[in-house]
Amino acid sequence: MAKERIYELAKELKMPSKDLVNLAKKEGMDVKTHMSSVTSDEANKLRSMAKGAGKPAAVKPAPKVQEHQSAPAKKEASRPANQGSQNNQNRNNRGNRNNNGNNNRHNSNNGSANANGNGGNQKRNQKRNQNNNNQGGQAANRNNNNGQGQGAHWFKKGKKNNKKKNRNKGNQRLRDTAPKAPTQRKDRPLPDVLEYTNGMNAQDLGKILHRSPAEIIKKLFMLGVMVNQNQSLDADTIEILAADYGIGAKEKVQVDVADLDHFFDERINNDANLADRPPVVTVMGHVDHGKTTLLDKIRHSHVTEGEAGGITQAIGAYQVKYNDKLITFLDTPGHAAFTEMRARGANITDITVLVVAADDGVMPQTIEAINHAKAAGTPIIVVVNKIDKPGANPDHVTEQLTEYGLIPEDWGGDTIYVKVSAKFGKNIDELLDMILLQAEVMELKANPGQNAAGAVVEARLDQGKGSVATLLVQQGTLHVGDPIVVGDTFGRVRTMTNENGRRIKDATPSTPVEITGLNGVPEAGDHFVVFDDEKTARAAGEERAKRAEDEKRRRTSHVTLDNLFDTMKKGEMKSLPIIIKADVQGSVEALAQSLQKIQVDGVRVDIIHKAVGAISESDVTLAEASNAIIIGFNVRPTPLAKSEAETNNIDIRLHRVIYNAIEEVEDAMKGMLEPVYEEEVLGQVEVRQLYKASKIGTIAGGMVVSGKITRDAKVRLIRDGVVIYEGELGSLKRFKDDAKEVKMGFECGLTIKNFNDVKENDVIEAYHMKEVPVK
């Protein structure tokens, strides 16, 4: 008996093989997969059951998608009812599509049987048709009009249908790319005041006003100003725009990034979040009055907690702790550092302690210290030292100091006096009490929560560490890693140590620290400022260094006897300022009178200062300011004066014989006159043979008959005793090699620049112009 496979039977019945397998299993047939076989009787039974199951599906209502289509629905009703389902059914069939088309035509009258098998496909069809209907009724109508069977759809109208599908896709793209309704964007509120800088453009203003550049441009257009987003606007236009928005306008002051003083003042004058800070004390006084002993006693007696046993001072400033309060002492080597810092605007001292020996009284340096402290505007605490020595007279010291306005409180004044013995440590605590009392009266405060600012106490170049600077923090807190600008240098704080050489991570106001990480060595008294980012710090530091270099170039170089003639030649001076220092007054007067007797036309000697004694720093400072020369007779400069003179290129001339000093100055002044030149013949060459070269010209070969001829000499061509031409040598050779000079008795070849009319037996004479000294 012939058997039929399930998949062939399902293909015949146009139903899924899976459904047919399930139907066969319900009837108890031995069927497992679509490849299973059934007998002819079983196949006929399945055919009848499949046809009977398809009848109810024929009376099902039409899909919902066709309810909305009036005209197309009538056309569809006249067509076989099973064609729509056949199209979807054929889409699931894996056989030949031509066969499917034939099957459609062959089974067109079996709609009732096929409808039941295609129920699931009809549901999917309904959903698909509903989607097409939502995309547009016209597109759905076109799709429904093509329901002529799957095979006919693909073979007869496949090309046309593809065009329609593409058209549908195009319509979908147009619908997707169509401009959507703009969403309502909430603009950020306008600022109360528009802070602007002259030259801003629409884009910059848009960022500040939280508006688009297009809106700004439109606003300006309505106000009668036509601009683009990158065009600069003047202040008037920006203010008009702000008024149109109903807000105020304020021009922002442009701050020069290299103006370190501006940033320094901004931080120093910040009154927000103020807190108490330790006082900064400078101890000054005459030599040998016990200043160093007093400082050492204070340091050894009141070391900061945690530093006991480690008293080695690493920097020129330190802190001591007394009664749970800190005091910062600046250990300046002398008044010079104090003066230098004050001259640079770094008034870092809060209180000046003036040390005066009870057995010595007021001395010249004591008076100088008083003047410095008064000029700096700092209160003075007088310490009368060495009260333990025999012959000490503190009252006499007080009487002397009253002449300079330092009247003690006991006498009705406001100056604090403390009598101490630094050697034995007597009344040291009383001195510290007075310092803290004075600081309390002064109400010293700072803001530790901001970027640090302060001044340089000292700086040096260390072979191992590089640039090392001792800083005193005046405002804010200095941290390791902070980008910093110090004077004309910049960098990042790499390390930070306290006065005992111990590394710390931060330094609060009035704390002295030693830092590394700068790109150069700053000067004492320079301000330092910490910036928010390294980029700004670098820009400020580089700009300051550039300006300092330019200023140095513009500054007139100091005159010396060596460059005196060149200086006068440029017309920069017509007088010679001189400072005279000698060992005795008689020598001073004799030297001054002798110099003023020198008579040279157009030049005069200007004695701006004359005195007895060694050449001091003040003399060097005066010479620097006056562009003068210092002449010393039987005196020497002090080490500091010598160092400062070398730094500032000040000319110091030292003599032991008055005549030598006068002669040296006279020679320099004569050099300032217009020089006289005369011709000096170097040698002669006799031309003996000529050579022609197309690229070079005429080459004269000859013998040096007298003197010598040099490459840089001027030459004249003499023919029969008459000068034919004067010019310069073009080349000079000995054999084939270039020569700088050829001496008498040697042959050479030479050319003359821009001249070729050389003949045999001509004489070429070499010469140069020599300056004749003024007599």
UniProtKB/Swiss-Prot annotation:
The lineage of its organism: Bacteria, Bacillati, Bacillota, Bacilli, Lactobacillales. Residues 276-445 form the tr-type G domain. GO terms for cellular component: cytosol. Residues 421-423 are annotated as: G5. It comes from the Bacteria. Residues 29-192 are annotated as: Disordered. This is Translation initiation factor IF-2. Residues 310-314 are annotated as: G2. It is found in: Cytoplasm. Residues 154-172 have a biased composition (Basic residues).
